[in-house]
Amino acid sequence: MSMSDPIADMLTRIRNAQMVEKVSVTMPSSKVKVAIAQVLKDEGYIDDFAVKAEGAKSELNIALKYYAGRPVIERLERVSKPGLRVYRGRNDIPQVMNGLGVAIVSTPKGVMTDRKARATGVGGEVICYVA
């Protein structure tokens, strides 16, 4: 069965794993998922991630992060969906929780945070909000 929105599946797997306090979560890998995981790691929302390739299939394993017994990620919300893509210019990229959260944006220069996209001067597709 083909998946209509693999990024939403990734975010849901992370959300569900954190609700039951799992140490890590595994999912099918792709270049975009790895780029999103890299942004989450750079921003301190996850401990680490690894890509394990087994033949033609590769899996992305994300080590989740907790602070004082609570998940570091409080909000993980998909913005741009296959049925309704959300694109923002460099001046219209939203701030999440007045700068306390992060919007992950797919730009021509790669997947990056809203702050980095504004600093670089590029717009793109708003993938999700993380707080």
Swiss-Prot record:
One of its GO terms (cellular component) is ribonucleoprotein complex. It comes from the Bacteria. InterPro entries: Ribosomal_uS8, Ribosomal_uS8_CS, Ribosomal_uS8_sf. Disulfide bonds: none annotated. Keywords: Ribonucleoprotein, Ribosomal protein, RNA-binding, rRNA-binding. One of its GO terms (biological process) is translation. GO terms for molecular function: rRNA binding; structural constituent of ribosome. Pfam families: Ribosomal_S8. Part of the 30S ribosomal subunit. Contacts proteins S5 and S12. Belongs to the universal ribosomal protein uS8 family. One of the primary rRNA binding proteins, it binds directly to 16S rRNA central domain where it helps coordinate assembly of the platform of the 30S subunit. This is Small ribosomal subunit protein uS8. It comes from Paraburkholderia phymatum (strain DSM 17167 / CIP 108236 / LMG 21445 / STM815) (Burkholderia phymatum).
